[in-house]
């Protein structure tokens, strides 16, 4: 399955160039099985061999990232904080989440929205998800777009640049991104475990 997906991704970039990169990155933001660690390094390789430029690939990928982020932002914003609060009030107990927990999370995001979006766009697995709380909190659109773009430029430049440098060995980028993903998953698991332990201690 993943092999077929990788082949399709490469075929799209071969046929459409920078436009294909932009479209794939839009899809990658809203459809996680499309992996940026394949899209972006391969785009760098294609540019390195002369079919386009590295700069064009970075610009295209960044435009795609912003458009994809806006899709998730728009969906979350259409739900809004009131509906989310009502959902937590009704069903939060099934997830061990109380309205007070949601309020604290919202307050934290409101204080750190810019940093969360900017840095979140540079972190595997978090890159797309960070658009959701931004939408729920209806973060002002201009800062959201600007800092989504800035964070995406960092990520896109790193992976496309690596692909261009490695050339036909661009696939070597993927294992390093995989390690970062494992680290992120481990951190998330630890945070969830800490949250669960804290909740249990409060009930005891």
Model-found features: residue ranges?
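Membrane-interfacial helix-loop-helix
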Residues: 1-22, 49-132, 136-139, 143, ...
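Transmembrane alpha-helix interface/packing and boundary motifs in multi-pass membrane proteins
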Residues: 22-40, 120
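Residue-level signal for transmembrane alpha-helical positions in Major Facilitator Superfamily
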Residues: 35, 39, 127, 158, ...
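Short amphipathic helix-loop junctions that connect adjacent transmembrane helices
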Residues: 40-48
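Transmembrane alpha-helical segments of integral membrane proteins
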Residues: 156-169
């Amino acid at each position: 399955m993943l092999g077929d997906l990788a082949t399709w991704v490469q075929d799209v970039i071969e046929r459409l160039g920078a436009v294909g990169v932009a479209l794939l990155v839009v899809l990658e933001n809203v459809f996680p099985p499309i992996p940026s660690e394949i899209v972006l390094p391969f785009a760098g390789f294609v540019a390195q061999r002369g079919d386009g430029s590295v700069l064009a690939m970075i610009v295209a990928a960044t435009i795609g990232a912003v458009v994809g982020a806006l899709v998730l932002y728009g969906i979350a914003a259409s739900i809004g904080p009131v509906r989310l609060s009502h959902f937590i009030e009704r069903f939060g107990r099934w997830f061990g989440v109380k309205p007070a927990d949601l309020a604290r999370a919202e307050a934290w995001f409101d204080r750190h929205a810019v940093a969360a979006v900017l840095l979140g766009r540079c972190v595997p697995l978090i890159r797309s998800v960070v658009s959701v709380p931004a939408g729920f909190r209806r973060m002002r659109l201009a800062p959201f777009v600007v800092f989504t773009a800035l964070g995406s430029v960092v990520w896109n430049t790193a992976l496309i640049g690596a692909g261009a440098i490695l050339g036909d060995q661009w696939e070597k980028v993927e294992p390093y991104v995989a390690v970062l993903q494992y680290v992120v998953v481990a951190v998330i698991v630890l945070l969830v475990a800490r949250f669960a332990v804290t909740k249990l201690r409060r009930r005891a």
